[in-house]
C-alpha cells in the first residue's frame, strides 16, 4: 500500500468572509489560539509523516510566501497563481503533474486540525487509506464534533458509510465546506 507523503494546501482564496481582518492579511495567516490557520494543517501533515506540501497562493501572496519560507517541515513548494485565481479544483489540477500519479492529501489552509492527541485526525485519515480499494477518501465530522461550524452540514452517510450530498429545500446542492 502506498501512503501519501505529499499534500496540496489550498491557500489562494480571497478571504472575503473574514473581512475586515483579511483586507491586509491572507486568511491562512489569521491566528487562532495564537497560531496562524495554515500552521494547524501543516503541523498536522508533518506529524503524519508528510514530507512535501505544495501551497497555492494568489491573494496577498508575498505575505504567505515570506511566512512559509521559515518552515522546515513539511518541505514547502509554492504554486504561484497570482495571475489567475483557479478556485479549489483548478488549484489541484494545476499541480497534478508534480505529483507523479501518487496519492496525496488536500487540505484547505483556512481550517485547523484538532482531535485526539493519541491519534490526530490526519493520522486517522492516513491510517484509513487503502489504495487497493479507494480512489478518494474524504474526512468528515459529525455536526456535534465540528469546531466553529453552525450550518446544517454538507453530507449524510448511509448505513454503509457512503456519502450523499445534502440538498436544500429547493433541491439544489448545498455549498460544500470540508
Question: Whereabouts are the PLM-identified features?
Answer:
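Conserved N-terminal catalytic core of the sugar/cofactor nucleotidyltransferase
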Residues: 1-9, 17, 31, 35-108, ...
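The conserved beta1-alpha1 loop
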Residues: 12
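Glycine-rich "HGGG/HGxG" loop immediately N-terminal to the catalytic nucleophile
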Residues: 15-17, 132
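Conserved catalytic-core motifs of eukaryotic protein kinase domains, centered on the activation segment
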Residues: 20-23
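Conserved core of the sugar-phosphate nucleotidyltransferase
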Residues: 76, 114-178
Amino acid at each position: 500500500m502506498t501512503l501519501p507523503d505529499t499534500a496540496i494546501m489550498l491557500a489562494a482564496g480571497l478571504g472575503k468572509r473574514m473581512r475586515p481582518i483579511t483586507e491586509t492579511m491572507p486568511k491562512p495567516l489569521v491566528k487562532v489560539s495564537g497560531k496562524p490557520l495554515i500552521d494547524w494543517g501543516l503541523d498536522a501533515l508533518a506529524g503524519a509523516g508528510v514530507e512535501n506540501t505544495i501551497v497555492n497562493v494568489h491573494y496577498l501572496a508575498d505575505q504567505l510566501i515570506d511566512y512559509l519560507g521559515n518552515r522546515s517541515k513539511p518541505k514547502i513548494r509554492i504554486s504561484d497563481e497570482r495571475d489567475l485565481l483557479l478556485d479549489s479544483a483548478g488549484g489541484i489540477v494545476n499541480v497534478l503533474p508534480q505529483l507523479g500519479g501518487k496519492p496525496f492529501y488536500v487540505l484547505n489552509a483556512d481550517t485547523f486540525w484538532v482531535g485526539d492527541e493519541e491519534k490526530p485526525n490526519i493520522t486517522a485519515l492516513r491510517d484509513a487509506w487503502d489504495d487497493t480499494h479507494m480512489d478518494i477518501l474524504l474526512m468528515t465530522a459529525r455536526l456535534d464534533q465540528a469546531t466553529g461550524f453552525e450550518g446544517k452540514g454538507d453530507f449524510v452517510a448511509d448505513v454503509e458509510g457512503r456519502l450523499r450530498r445534502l440538498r436544500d429545500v429547493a433541491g439544489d446542492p448545498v455549498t460544500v465546506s470540508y
